[in-house]
């Protein structure tokens, strides 16, 4: 039984913008403030259909996109505090570079980078059956020993994997599910027959 690892990176553009923002706000000492402001912006982005259209539309001019982003930032009160000004300027640069379509990926990459800087890692765990408290604790301890930091488990159940676990940790996926093992065995048997 072998664990298979596969990289699951966010698009490179999203990572670059997120890391640039993180580096800037870390140097200035505003990571927490920008994280909160970015979370507010993300909520508005998810709820406001007009803003979502603006972000996704390739037909609007750069000027219109920058103007709309500035207006949203103003409504959030981002222009009045230093952290808000940094975020406002960052979002305007994203808009000016026609990268608003990558904004949700940028937000996600930024959140990952902040969690990583705090030594926190979020692990998505998919199991065929709900895990009991002892299994959760044992899995958490094992993952924390691997990453050397705090691990938060996000659990979900998918009976289609038949047994075992699928763990997504950072950029890696560890798949020990019975469904994957059976699929691998099936491919190996087909290879032997041909």
UniProtKB/Swiss-Prot annotation:
UniProt GO MF annotations: proton-transporting ATP synthase activity, rotational mechanism
Topology of this chain in the membrane: Peripheral membrane protein
UniProt key word DNA repair: no
PANTHER family membership: ATP SYNTHASE DELTA CHAIN (PTHR11910)
Name assigned to this protein: ATP synthase subunit delta
Compartments where located: Cell inner membrane
Known partners and oligomeric status: F-type ATPases have 2 components, F(1) - the catalytic core - and F(0) - the membrane proton channel. F(1) has five subunits: alpha(3), beta(3), gamma(1), delta(1), epsilon(1). F(0) has three main subunits: a(1), b(2) and c(10-14). The alpha and beta chains form an alternating ring which encloses part of the gamma chain. F(1) is attached to F(0) by a central stalk formed by the gamma and epsilon chains, while a peripheral stalk is formed by the delta and b chains.
Keyword Cell inner membrane belongs to the record: yes
Family membership noted in the UniProt record: Belongs to the ATPase delta chain family.
Signal peptide (from-to): none
NCBIfam families, A to Z: ATP_synt_delta, PRK05758.3-2
Organism this protein belongs to: Bartonella bacilliformis (strain ATCC 35685 / KC583 / Herrer 020/F12,63)
InterPro entries, alphabetized: ATP_synth_OSCP/delta_N_sf (IPR026015), ATPase_OSCP/d_CS (IPR020781), ATPase_OSCP/dsu (IPR000711)
GO CC annotation, single: plasma membrane
Main location (coarse class): membrane
PROSITE patterns: ATPASE_DELTA
Role according to the record: F(1)F(0) ATP synthase produces ATP from ADP in the presence of a proton or sodium gradient. F-type ATPases consist of two structural domains, F(1) containing the extramembraneous catalytic core and F(0) containing the membrane proton channel, linked together by a central stalk and a peripheral stalk. During catalysis, ATP synthesis in the catalytic domain of F(1) is coupled via a rotary mechanism of the central stalk subunits to proton translocation. This protein is part of the stalk that links CF(0) to CF(1). It either transmits conformational changes from CF(0) to CF(1) or is implicated in proton conduction.
Keyword annotations of the record: ATP synthesis, Cell inner membrane, Cell membrane, CF(1), Hydrogen ion transport, Ion transport, Membrane, Transport
């Amino acid at each position: 039984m072998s664990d298979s690892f596969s990289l699951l990176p966010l698009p490179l553009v999203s990572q670059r913008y997120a890391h640039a923002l993180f580096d800037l706000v870390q140097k200035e000492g505003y990571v927490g403030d920008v994280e909160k402001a970015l979370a507010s912006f993300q909520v508005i982005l998810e709820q406001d259909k007009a803003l979502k259209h603006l972000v996704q539309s390739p037909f609007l001019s750069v000027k219109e996109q920058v103007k709309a982003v500035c207006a949203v930032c103003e409504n959030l009160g981002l222009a009045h505090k230093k952290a808000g000004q940094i975020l406002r300027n960052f979002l305007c640069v994203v808009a000016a570079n026609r990268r608003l379509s990558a904004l949700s990926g940028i937000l996600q990459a930024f959140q990952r980078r902040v969690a990583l800087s705090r030594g926190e890692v979020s692990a998505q765990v998919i199991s065929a059956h709900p895990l009991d408290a002892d299994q959760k604790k044992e899995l958490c301890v094992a993952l924390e020993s691997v990453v050397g930091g705090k691990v938060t488990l996000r659990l979900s159940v998918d009976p289609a994997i038949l047994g075992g676990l699928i763990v997504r940790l950072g950029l890696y996926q560890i798949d020990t599910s019975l469904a994957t093992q059976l699929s691998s065995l099936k491919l190996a048997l087909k290879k032997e027959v041909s």
